[in-house]
Amino acid sequence: MASPSGKGSWTPEAPGFGPRALARDLVDSVDDAEGLYVAVERCPLCNTTRRRLTCAKCVQSGDFVYFDGRDRERFIDKKERLSQLKNKQEEFQKEVLKAMEGKRLTDQLRWKIMSCKMRIEQLKQTICKGNEEMKKNSEGLLKNKEKNQKLYSRAQRHQEKKEKIQRHNRKLGDLVEKKTIDLKSHYERLARLRRSHILELTSIIFPIDEVKTSGRDPADVSSETDSAMTSSMVSKLAEARRTTYLSGRWVCDDHNGDTSISITGPWISLPNNGDYSAYYNWVEEKKTTQGPDMEHNNPAYTISAALGYATQLVNIVSHILDINLPKKLCNSEFCGENLSKQKLTRAVRKLNANILYLCSSQHVNLDQLQPLHTLRNLMHLVSPRSEHLGRSGPFEVRADLEESMEFVDPGVAGESDASGDERVSDEETDLGTDWENLPSPRFCDIPSQPVEVSQSQSTQVSPPIASSSAGGMISSAAASVTSWFKAYTGHR
């Protein structure tokens, strides 16, 4: 602090050199150098090589000043002032810290306020968007409510309609059930009426009976006339005579040849086995023999008359039962003179097909039917023992029975008329086998055409042979049937 030249320089205290340490060094150096003058001795204050001006005690107590007079304040005073300045500095620092703490708190609050404002602004925007969304949702909710209300009211209407339809369906069900019962009763009453009419028809006008024949078996006759024929051959002939083709197979018929079936009387009958060879023989004989035939009991007349009556009966029964026949066959088909074998066979096949069709419609036991037994099948059809006679409704013809209906003699089917003047006209063709059987007679209001018996048809029934007794018989029978049928159906 003091120097001899008065040009001491103040240097800041180095680290580790505090006032106490400096005083201790000065005392030690003074004590050690008491009474010595060393050229290299340096002042502990100014660090210059000067003479010692103060004692160690003064240095230790801080009681020394500059000797050049520039500053009269002692070191100890400076030290006290320094401590006071430090205290003031600390106080100022505290005040500044206090002031800055308030500022810091203010800034923090400002930042908090700013952040809160920003958050509030964001929340406002979010709330605004939320309000818009809510408004849209509210509008959608109102629309959905209106739509739901409409759907609810519509559902109510549909429920009412459903209940109304259910009530209507119940009423219709009751009505249908009642109508079904009425229809069933009508069908039963109609079946009874049909049955009574058919039975009345077959009991008064067209009675069909079984007639026993007294003719001997040709096998027995041949065995008596031909002594060379063995017993095995006779048995084979007898077995062949009693065999008939039925439903695609050959079956034994015990009635074959022993009986015949008559219609309208015992004098008009058909062979039970469907053998019309007597008619064929008569036609061949008629071709060679000229002149009128005066024999009243000629088999050809009885066969043609029986087939004509059977045709009339089948057409009338089909009209009563309201059934369309699969084959078109006129009542006068068998009334012509000298029918060829081919034409007669074709007409008989149509008649048998119609009879079997009617038997299928009336649920006749098919085991009793044989395709070639015309009048026997017809007798089973109109028999009083037939349970389903007069029924209405759908039916089905078995395939094997259809095959049996189409069976004919191959020799007859392959023959051709040598005269060439016989052609199949449109009236002789089939009506068609593709017809669909309708389930109810309600849709079959149009009766079959062949049943319309007119006066012109009745005139066609009698053949042009005036001298033939069979022609007169058929003509009178046809006229009586026509008059009875007109009176029966009310067509006057």
Curated annotation (Swiss-Prot):
UniProt feature coiled coil, ranges: 70-180
GO cellular component, one term: extrinsic component of omegasome membrane
Pfam annotation, one family: ATG14
Residues where Phosphothreonine is found: 429
Entry's induction text: Expression is controlled by forkhead box O FoxO1 transcription factor and circadian rhythms.
InterPro entries from the UniProt entry: UV_resistance/autophagy_Atg14
BATS: region residues: 413-492
Membrane topology value: Peripheral membrane protein
Biased composition (Acidic residues): 424-433
Keywords associated with the record: Autophagy, Coiled coil, Cytoplasm, Cytoplasmic vesicle, Endoplasmic reticulum, Membrane, Phosphoprotein, Ubl conjugation
GO biological process, one term: autophagosome membrane docking
GO molecular function per UniProt: GTPase binding; phosphatidylinositol 3-kinase inhibitor activity; protein-membrane adaptor activity
Tissue: Widely expressed.
Locations listed in the record: Cytoplasm; Endoplasmic reticulum membrane; Preautophagosomal structure membrane; Cytoplasmic vesicle, Autophagosome membrane
Subunit details: Forms homooligomers; homo-oligomerization is essential for the roles in membrane tethering and enhancement of SNARE-mediated fusion. Component of the PI3K (PI3KC3/PI3K-III/class III phosphatidylinositol 3-kinase) complex I (PI3KC3-C1) in which the core composed of the catalytic subunit PIK3C3, the regulatory subunit PIK3R4 and BECN1 is associated with ATG14. PI3KC3-C1 displays a V-shaped architecture with PIK3R4 serving as a bridge between PIK3C3 and the ATG14:BECN1 subcomplex. PI3KC3-C1 can associate with further regulatory subunits. Interacts with PIK3CB.
Family from the record: Belongs to the ATG14 family.
Functional description taken from the UniProt entry: Required for both basal and inducible autophagy. Determines the localization of the autophagy-specific PI3-kinase complex PI3KC3-C1. Plays a role in autophagosome formation and MAP1LC3/LC3 conjugation to phosphatidylethanolamine. Promotes BECN1 translocation from the trans-Golgi network to autophagosomes. Enhances PIK3C3 activity in a BECN1-dependent manner. Essential for the autophagy-dependent phosphorylation of BECN1. Stimulates the phosphorylation of BECN1, but suppresses the phosphorylation of PIK3C3 by AMPK.
Matches recorded under PANTHER family: BECLIN 1-ASSOCIATED AUTOPHAGY-RELATED KEY REGULATOR
Name of the protein in its database record: Beclin 1-associated autophagy-related key regulator
